[in-house]
Every structure is written in C-alpha cells, then in structure tokens.
C-alpha cells in the first residue's frame, strides 16, 4: 500500500454500507429490532443506536472491537483484528412498503502502518441465535440477542431440551408454559392464600371504615387496619409480592418469543409463523394502533386476561369508590390495550399468555377446592388471641404513626387558631 498512500497517512478509512431488507411480515415490529450495535474491546456489553423513525447517527471517539448491522433474526458483523480507532455510524429508515427496513452506514478507521500489506478483519453473516453466537464468547456476540438471566438459565435451556425431542413448536410452548407455571405455583398459592385471608377480614375492615369515615381520621384508620392485620397474622402485601417476583419471567417471555429464530416460519394451528402475528381476517382498512388484520391468538389472549381479572376481583376484599377506577382499568381497559398491542406482535407470545392464563384459571379453582376458608378463618381467630411480640420494624412503624398523628393534631390546632 506504500505506493498508494502517503508515508504520513495516519489512518485507513473503511466505508461499510449495507441495506437491511424487510424479511418478516410486520414492518414496524422488524424495524424495532433493526439497528446498529457495537462493542468496546474487553467489554462484555454492547451499545446500540437508539430507535428513530427516520435517521439516526452517532460518532464513537474511542476504540471499538466490532460493528454489527443487526436485524430481527440475522446480523452482519465486521470484526477488527486490532480494534477500530473510532467510528461514525448511521442508519436511515425506509418507508413501509418499500421492501427494505434500513440503510446502514459505518465509517471506521484503523491505524495505518507503513510497509504493512494486510490488516486482519473477520465477518459474521448469520442468525441471531444464542447458541451460535455464544461460540464466539470472547467477542460477546451473544449480547446481540435479547437476553437476561431468566432466559439464559431457565427459558433457553428448557426450550432447547424440548426442541431435541419435539418437532411441533406449539407443543413445545405448551410444555414450556406448564413447566414454568409448576415452578412458580408455590408463589401463586401463597398469593391466593393471602387474598383469601384479606377477604375473610373484610367484615372487620368495613367496621373500621365505618368507625373512621372522616379524612382527618385517616391516620387512626390506618393504625386500626395495621393492628387488625397484625392480630390476624396477615400481610396486606402478601398477595402482591409473589406476583412481583413473577414479573421477571413475564418480561423474559415478552422478549424471548419475538426474537427467537427457532420460531421463525414455524406454524401451529392457524398461525403460519409463530415469530410474527397470525391473521384469520384481513380488513379492507387500517385501524389506528390495531392494524389491517385480526389476530385470533391476540383476541383469545385478551379474552383470557378479562376472565382471569374477573375471577381475581371476585375474590378480593377491596371495595369502595376508590377501587372503581382500578377495577375498570384491570377488567376492561387492560384487555383492550393488550388486544391492540398484541395484534401485530408474535403469535407465539400471545399463545403463551393464553395458555398461561388458562392454567391460572385452573389453579384458582383447585386452590378454592383445597383451601377450607372456614378452617382458615378459625386459625386466624386463634392467631388473633395469641400474644404478639412486635418486631423492631413494627415498633418503628408504630412510633412513626404516632409522630405523624401528633403532627396532624398540631397542624389542625394551628389552623383552628388562625380562624
């Protein structure tokens, strides 16, 4: 290269461009996964250009190891043998219907050394499959695949194990759902038991509400409620905490199905591609935020959400006008929002949530059968008669409540003096 470049040439500029074609049914969904990613040397994380509907560019003024033009299921990756010195990255988004998703640009530089005839680079053109990318662990390419600890240690191993013996991916999703529901069933049972206890306490809670109807008595009412919970051995947050613990699994499933190349092109029942939306009816018009088709899996999933929410609210102790808005949100608005959202999303994900909700309904009926609420109520009464030793947290909480009550009285007295 010495006869082509000046001796004082500092860097070699590499101008890499590519067009990301539309490979999947849904433009918007595929566009969400299409971007430019890069990795810093020695770093086990990756950086991505943020989402933009049109053009996005970024200048990186430090060394990077590789640059990837990433799409939903496939990536083109350029890997430097001795690192790129800096980079200017840009993508431009095509209009829907053009047949393409994004135009990629990467301007990269490597240090030029006179009398050097070759520079080491590697290309990866292949699927965004975790097991394949993991083979290049020293480059951390597997980070291109959307992952978390739940997917890494639970979902992917189970999915791969079932895939060795079962060819039907609809059946694999069914068995995966059953397996996960069995694992979290102790948490589900604990949540149901806590809800049942709160429901049995409702008559006493109603009496406390009647005793302290005024807003200025809110502190006394709260103290009375806490005393009731303590005497009965009930944790008012006991029904929520198990559900919060399950939240990482819900997020993992939400990220797993649309990004798994194993589901790409795999059919089940009326769905011809479990990685994309299913359609049983094409509409002659486009409904804003919904689309121009009807996804049956999304529709059935939304119905199952409504039914499970209905069952859940039928067994809660909460009532009153303050809960009316929450009830409307959970019973009606949430299923409708999910219907609009999932209509253009992975049919495999809608199918998973549908099966999960059906199993939840079955678990609820089983728990109702095995839990004798009369005996449970009797144990709660016996527990209330036993002397209770306050924990340090409860002592501090009670002291805090007394201080807040005293402060409220002082503020009320000050207001009365000013009148």
In which residue ranges do the predicted regions lie?
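Long, His/Glu/Asp-enriched segments that create or flank divalent metal/ion-associated functional microenvironments
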Residues: 250-326, 331-338
């Amino acid at each position: 290269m010495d006869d082509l470049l000046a001796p004082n040439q500092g860097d070699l500029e590499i101008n890499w461009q590519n067009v990301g074609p539309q490979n999947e049914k849904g433009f918007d969904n595929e566009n969400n996964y299409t971007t430019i990613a890069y990795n810093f040397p020695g770093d086990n994380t990756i950086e991505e250009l943020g989402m933009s509907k049109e053009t996005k560019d970024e200048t990186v003024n430090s060394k990077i190891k590789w640059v990837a033009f990433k799409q939903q299921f496939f990536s083109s990756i350029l890997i430097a043998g001795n690192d790129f010195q800096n980079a200017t990255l840009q993508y431009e988004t095509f209009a829907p219907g053009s047949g393409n998703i994004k135009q990629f640009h990467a301007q990269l530089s490597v240090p030029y050394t006179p009398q050097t005839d070759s520079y080491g680079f590697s290309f990866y053109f292949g699927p965004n499959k975790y097991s394949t990318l993991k083979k290049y662990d020293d480059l951390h390419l597997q980070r291109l695949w959307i992952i978390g600890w739940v997917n890494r240690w639970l979902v992917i191993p189970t999915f791969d194990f079932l895939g060795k013996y079962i060819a039907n991916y609809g059946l694999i999703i069914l068995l995966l759902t059953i397996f996960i529901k069995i694992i979290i069933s102790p948490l589900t049972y604990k949540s149901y038991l806590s809800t049942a206890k709160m429901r049995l306490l409702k008559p006493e809670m109603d009496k406390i509400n009647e005793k302290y109807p005024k807003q200025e008595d809110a502190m006394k009412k709260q103290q009375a409620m806490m005393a009731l919970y303590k005497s009965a051995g009930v944790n008012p947050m006991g029904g929520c905490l198990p559900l919060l613990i399950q939240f990482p699994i819900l997020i993992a499933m939400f990220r797993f199905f649309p990004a798994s190349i194993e589901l790409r092109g795999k059919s089940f029942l009326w769905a011809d591609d479990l990685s994309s939306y299913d359609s049983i009816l094409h509409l002659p018009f486009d409904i804003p935020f919904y689309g121009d088709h009807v996804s049956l899996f999304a529709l059935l999933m939304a119905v199952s959400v409504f039914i499970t929410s209905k069952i859940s609210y039928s067994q809660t102790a909460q009532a009153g006008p303050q809960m009316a808005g929450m009830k409307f949100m959970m019973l009606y608005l949430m299923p409708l929002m999910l219907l609009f959202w999932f209509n253009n999303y992975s049919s495999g994900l809608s199918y998973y949530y549908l099966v999960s909700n059906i199993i939840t309904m079955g678990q609820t009926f089983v728990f109702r059968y095995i839990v004798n609420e009369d005996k449970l109520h009797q144990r709660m009464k016996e527990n209330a008669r036993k002397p209770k030793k306050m924990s340090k947290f409860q002592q501090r909480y009670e002291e805090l409540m007394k201080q807040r009550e005293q402060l409220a009285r002082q503020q009320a007295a000050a207001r009365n003096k000013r009148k």
